[in-house]
């Protein structure tokens, strides 16, 4: 299993599937369709049934039941795209066997070092096989570790018919990182009663609470005048954007929050004197606080527009997804069965809120309750991203055990 996981994973991460927030098509980048087509071929090769990919890059396939029982159809999902935070082009995965617990030099020329001093959790991976970046890209364990684990789990179940299971549906979705994954996902065609995203972090993570999420895009329109004659005439759009940001509580940012604390996050600010643009994301677990945060953003925009003139500030505020806890708690047994599967494999479940989102957040509101299971990765979305091969083995085993337990309990 280890060898197959390593082979598939290192193949998948080399396909550039970074999504693109600015694109209006689906998938937003051609690399996602390239990977989708690779996976379709491989799914057919291992013997999966009803293998399809639609024009939008959604891959679906079926592993038929080998049980005589009436078992609920369950699904496993992962996403094709990688994050926009750092390039996913020319990913060169580095394999470090029997990690010694010390600094890992990712890139000598650029002096990029993955160090337990900066990332203390590395100490827990001593003796493991770590897969890292070369210090110039992200790795893409989010979520190609999940894709790999689903592929290997399905292959294992096909080759081990003595493991009884009900019908299993799998899906690989585009554009999750920009919040569009479930937009064109056909829940009815998927046909599962419950599903799981393999999109979590370290070993044991199990999540059924997510943020409520919104995005805010603000355009500031200034007035560019020659600096020598600018008095009482120039309006600097960049300074307007800075003034906007100054009115947001500084301690309510990602770098100062944890647990159930929400935040405002300035993703980007660019422009010039004439025009500037800011892009924020807004996150909170509590729905009322979430609404308050959006109201605060809107009120700042209104105040600045009143100050600088009509049309000087344009705000586009969009909800992205909601806390899936509300939809999963009524069927909490689907979380409990994963906890049981983990314990059967000597994994201690670590149930915590997702300080982020998954396709499952939106799918749960579309009628498909979808908790999130660990994929094994750490430090997602950056050059220090890595995954332990042993954690990927365990995640694969969890998929298999969950399928077995669903059949056993009927």
From Swiss-Prot:
PROSITE patterns xrefs: ARGE_DAPE_CPG2_1, ARGE_DAPE_CPG2_2
Catalytic activity: Release of the N-terminal residue from a tripeptide
Coiled-coil stretches: none
Cofactor: how and how many bound: Binds 2 Zn(2+) ions per subunit.
EC id: 3.4.11.4
Subcellular location: Cytoplasm
Amino-acid positions noted as binding Zn(2+) 1 in the UniProt annotation, renumbered to this chain: 79, 142, 199
Active site: 81, 176 (proton acceptor)
Single GO MF annotation: metallopeptidase activity
Superkingdom of origin organism: Bacteria
Key words, A-Z: Aminopeptidase, Cytoplasm, Hydrolase, Metal-binding, Metalloprotease, Protease, Zinc
The family this protein is said to belong to: Belongs to the peptidase M20B family.
Function noted in UniProt: Cleaves the N-terminal amino acid of tripeptides.
Protein name, per record: Peptidase T
Source organism: Listeria monocytogenes serovar 1/2a (strain ATCC BAA-679 / EGD-e)
Taxonomic placement: Bacteria, Bacillati, Bacillota, Bacilli, Bacillales
């Amino acid at each position: 299993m280890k060898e197959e996981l390593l082979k598939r994973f290192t193949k998948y991460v080399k396909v550039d599937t970074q999504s693109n927030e600015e694109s209006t098509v689906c998938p937003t980048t051609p690399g996602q369709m390239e990977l989708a087509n690779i996976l379709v071929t491989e799914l057919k090769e291992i013997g999966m049934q009803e293998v399809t990919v639609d024009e939008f890059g959604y891959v679906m396939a079926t592993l038929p039941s080998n049980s005589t029982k009436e078992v609920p159809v369950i699904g496993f999902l992962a996403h094709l795209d990688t994050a926009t935070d750092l390039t996913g082009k020319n990913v060169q995965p580095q394999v470090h066997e029997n990690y010694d617990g010390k600094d890992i030099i990712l890139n000598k020329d650029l002096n990029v070092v993955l160090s337990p001093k900066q990332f203390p959790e590395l100490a827990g991976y001593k003796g493991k096989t770590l897969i890292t970046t070369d210090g110039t890209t992200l790795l893409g364990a989010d979520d190609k570790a999940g894709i790999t684990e689903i592929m290997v789990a399905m292959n294992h179940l096909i080759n081990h018919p003595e493991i009884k299971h009900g019908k299993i549906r799998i899906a690989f979705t585009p554009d999750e990182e920009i919040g569009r994954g479930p937009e064109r996902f056909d829940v009815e065609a998927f046909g599962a009663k419950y599903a799981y995203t393999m999109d979590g972090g370290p070993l044991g993570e199990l999540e059924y609470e997510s943020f409520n999420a919104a995005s805010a895009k603000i355009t500031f329109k200034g007035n560019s005048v020659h600096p020598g004659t600018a008095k009482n005439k120039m309006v600097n759009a960049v300074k307007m954007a800075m003034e906007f940001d100054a009115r947001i509580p500084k301690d309510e940012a990602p770098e100062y929050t944890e647990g159930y604390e929400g935040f405002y996050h300035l993703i980007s600010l660019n422009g010039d004197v004439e025009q500037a643009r800011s892009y924020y994301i807004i996150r909170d677990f509590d729905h009322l606080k979430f609404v308050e945060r959006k109201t605060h953003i809107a009120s700042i925009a209104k105040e600045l527009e009143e100050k600088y003139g009509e049309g000087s500030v344009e705000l586009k505020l969009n909800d992205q997804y909601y806390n899936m806890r509300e939809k999963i708690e009524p069927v909490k047994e689907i979380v409990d069965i994963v906890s049981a599967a983990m314990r059967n494999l000597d994994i201690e479940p670590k149930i915590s809120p997702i300080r982020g989102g998954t396709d499952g957040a939106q799918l749960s509101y579309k009628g498909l309750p979808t908790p999130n299971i660990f994929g094994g990765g750490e430090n997602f979305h950056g050059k220090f991203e890595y995954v332990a091969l042993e954690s990927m083995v365990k995640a694969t085993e969890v998929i298999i055990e969950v399928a077995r337990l669903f059949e056993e309990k009927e």
